[in-house]
Amino acid sequence: MPRASPTTKLDPRQVLTGAVLRASALLEITQSGLAQILGLSPSTVSRMANGTYTLDVQKKEWELGALFVRLFRSLDALIGSNDPAARGWLNAQNRGLVGRPIDLIRSTEGLVRVVQYLDSARGRI
């Protein structure tokens, strides 16, 4: 894998957009599901996947994308890079959250709750 040289300036929009797309792929979240999570249209997420749209740092989609990546990273740290287990956790009923995380993260409030839940679980290990 090529490494960026110290003088290479990475575009934060491309970095976050790529991280969001990779996390959604590993968690097997559809483009329409990702659109709901980010508050975007399915066609905008399709353009993201095609590389013709990047998340806008001035819009809410940026914050939601950053939260989604944080959710993925927290879940990855807790489960140990076991993608099938992460998908299972995301799709299973969770008593602590009173719902399935995959359903909850489709709203801003639910996404924040799931991230806080994972953060608190990480704090215990």
Predicted regions span which residues?
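Non-transmembrane "mature" sequence context
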Residues: 1-125
